[in-house]
């Protein structure tokens, strides 16, 4: 007898509602990804074609070269963005997170079996992170400038106002950062969707008038164009690479939106819109070479120019906002990985922990962006500075991905080389091409990157020397507290939490407390906050409690580099491990070290002096760990390194 199983109407309806809810969630994330992830690469059509055929490249403006250049752009988008990032690199998630920091941690964990290789991978990742800041300066400058330059097309007499208007837009953008982007952020997706729709529509209009441009879909036209350039190839590629800037955002924002929404957004809207617009600009230039003065804005009829300038300015502001937010996020991760000193972090949303504002980063970025705008003066001049930092970051991403594929995923060496070798060759060509523009402005983002790299490397090495000094000079913890347990010293009926970097030596704050106050608390916690090379640490793994001697416990609080530290909240979890605390009867003792540079130690004297200056200006550990101000006692000590 055959039994036929049927779903109840209620269960069927429940499953349908869940499917609808999931689809709505994916749709919302896809819309968000379009607004945040693709703003940078989506505004590249504003200046790319203009720079490819500028006098600096020497590429003739004729049908053959136009079709060839557009073909290189199209197949570059297919190879670099679609195959490398959308297909391969989005698979390399670090517990769902992406970005150069997450990839570095993943590669170092997978392949860093020896200290030398691990250090090399970490330094490579740190360089990639440092170069990101160069991009964070150039992107707002070139994007806003290129959008506002549309005023020149509207009326040539408005040219003197381009620079002041650009500066005003940028200052306004950075000024509103402290208020957060929660409300305005809801408009990002719809505005950028409209932007891509306009890109596609204006491109189609021109293609219909000059369908010969569709020959650019043939990859042989790209090969022929590159082959015809000879050694001039690198100059041409140095301009074409502008079409790919912003591609790193696909991977960096994976943790915010997820892999699938980013892939859907690219394949469903962004790639078609970009391809159609570049072909449309090529078609326009084939019909009217004089449009080279500004091929993007010449796509529009005269009556549409002012709305086009307004929409382009909105799109570039959104693209800049995404880069600025990325700089905040990157800095916070660098601080928690021990690469930069503590900085003030303000949370601008009660609902979204990822929406933060960092005043120091904001004002330094603003100063650098304004310097770039005033110093270079136009989007064409800035285009020379753009690219070198981006392509070096792309190359570093490919190198790190190789180690993840080979050692993290366990593929044989030939497979790992096959998966990344072509991209490694492409990225190398792009880096060489952009390096030719070093003296024309490429030095600017590189200098920024090198300065950040020196700061990061110095801070990391300085902290290592500091902890080594403490370990060598301070007494061991266990024998010391064992002797205290036998002492009849008066004990205060409260809890003392001693925050330390090295849990195996006696905290300086404890020594000061005993020396000056002649008192010890009933409950003493030797607290260590450890940031791991993973994005998130779940609550059940947040705290580890180890009893030492009566009245003393060692407590380790674990965070990922994207977690937000909150020590009082973490201490409440000690109850689950048999250590019940009353946080209202708890005092936090901190040691603040004053660094004294000493010749002949672990770093050159100038780096020690730099580390000492960074240490003096580091943000308060009280705010960083979210300690209650009225329960903190801070004691100072001088440390030679």
Curated annotation (Swiss-Prot):
Keyword Ubl conjugation: no
GO cellular component, one term: plasma membrane
Catalytic activity: K(+)(in) + H(+)(in) = K(+)(out) + H(+)(out)
Annotated compartments: Cell inner membrane
Pfam families cross-referenced by the UniProt entry: K_trans, K_trans_C
Keywords of this entry: Cell inner membrane, Cell membrane, Ion transport, Membrane, Potassium, Potassium transport, Symport, Transmembrane, Transmembrane helix, Transport
Its membrane topology: Multi-pass membrane protein
GO molecular function, one term: potassium ion transmembrane transporter activity
Parts of the chain that traverse the membrane: 26-46, 70-90, 122-142, 156-176, 187-207, 230-250, 266-286, 299-319, 363-383, 385-405, 413-433, 438-458
Predominant subcellular localization, coarse grouping: membrane
Keyword Transport tagged: yes
HAMAP family (UniProt xref): Kup (MF_01522)
Family per similarity comment: Belongs to the HAK/KUP transporter (TC 2.A.72) family.
Described function: Transport of potassium into the cell. Likely operates as a K(+):H(+) symporter.
Full protein name: Probable potassium transport system protein Kup 1
């Amino acid at each position: 007898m055959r039994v036929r199983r049927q779903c109840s109407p209620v269960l069927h309806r429940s499953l349908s509602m869940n499917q609808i809810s999931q689809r709505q969630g994916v749709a919302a994330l896809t819309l968000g990804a379009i607004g945040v992830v693709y703003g940078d690469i989506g505004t590249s059509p504003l200046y790319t074609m203009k720079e490819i055929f500028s006098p600096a490249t020497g590429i003739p403006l004729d049908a053959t070269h136009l079709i060839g250049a557009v073909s290189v752009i199209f197949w570059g988008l297919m190879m670099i963005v679609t195959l490398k990032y959308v297909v391969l690199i989005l698979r390399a998630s670090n517990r769902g997170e992406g970005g150069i920091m997450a990839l570095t941690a993943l590669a170092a964990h997978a392949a860093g079996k020896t200290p030398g290789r691990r250090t090399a991978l970490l330094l490579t990742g740190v360089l990639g992170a440092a170069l990101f800041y160069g991009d964070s300066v150039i992107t707002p400058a070139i994007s806003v400038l290129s959008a506002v330059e549309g005023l020149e097309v509207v009326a040539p007499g408005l040219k003197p106002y381009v620079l002041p208007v650009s500066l005003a837009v940028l200052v306004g953008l950075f000024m509103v950062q402290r208020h957060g982007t929660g409300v305005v952020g809801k408009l990002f997706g719809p505005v950028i969707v409209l932007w891509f729709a306009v890109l596609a529509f204006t491109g189609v209009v021109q293609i219909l008038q000059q369908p010969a441009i569709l020959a650019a879909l043939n990859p042989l036209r790209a090969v022929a164009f590159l082959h015809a350039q000879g050694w001039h190839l690198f100059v041409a590629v140095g301009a074409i690479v502008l079409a790919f800037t912003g591609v790193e955002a696909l991977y960096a924002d994976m943790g915010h939106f997820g892999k699938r929404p980013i892939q859907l957004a690219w394949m469903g809207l962004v790639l078609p819109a970009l391809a159609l617009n570049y072909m449309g600009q090529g078609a326009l230039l084939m019909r009217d070479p004089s449009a080279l003065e500004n091929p993007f804005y010449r796509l529009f009829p005269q009556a549409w120019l002012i709305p086009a300038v307004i929409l382009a300015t909105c799109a570039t502001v959104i693209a800049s906002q995404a880069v600025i937010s990325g700089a905040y996020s990157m800095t916070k991760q660098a601080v928690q990985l021990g690469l930069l000193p503590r900085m003030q972090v303000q949370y601008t949303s009660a609902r979204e922990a990822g929406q933060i504002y960092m005043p120091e980063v904001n004002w330094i970025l603003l100063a650098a962006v304004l310097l770039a705008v005033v110093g270079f003066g136009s989007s064409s001049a800035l285009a020379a500075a753009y690219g070198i930092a981006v392509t070096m970051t792309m190359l570093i991403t490919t190198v790190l991905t190789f180690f993840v594929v080979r050692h993290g995923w366990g593929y044989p060496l030939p497979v790992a080389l096959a998966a990344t070798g072509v991209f490694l060759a492409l990225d190398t060509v792009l880096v060489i091409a952009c390096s030719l523009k070093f003296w024309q402005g490429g030095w600017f983002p590189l200098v920024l990157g090198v300065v950040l790299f020196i700061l990061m490397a110095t801070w990391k090495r300085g902290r290592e020397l500091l902890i080594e000094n403490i370990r060598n000079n301070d007494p061991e913890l266990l024998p010391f507290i064992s002797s205290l347990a036998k002492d009849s010293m008066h004990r205060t009926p409260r809890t003392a939490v001693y925050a330390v970097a090295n849990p195996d030596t006696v905290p300086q704050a404890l020594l000061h407390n005993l020396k000056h106050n002649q008192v010890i608390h009933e409950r003493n916690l030797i607290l260590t906050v450890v940031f791991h090379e993973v994005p998130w640490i779940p609550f059940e793994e947040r705290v580890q409690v180890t009893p030492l001697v009566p009245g003393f416990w060692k407590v380790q609080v674990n965070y990922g580099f994207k977690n937000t530290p909150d020590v009082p909240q973490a201490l409440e979890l000690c109850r689950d491990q048999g250590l019940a605390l009353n946080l209202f009867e708890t005092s936090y003792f901190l040691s603040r070290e004053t660094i004294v540079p000493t010749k002949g130690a672990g770093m050159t004297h100038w780096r020690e002096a730099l580390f000492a200056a960074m240490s003096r200006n580091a943000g308060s550990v009280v705010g960083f760990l979210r300690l209650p101000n009225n329960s903190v006692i801070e004691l100072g000590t001088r440390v030679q390194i």
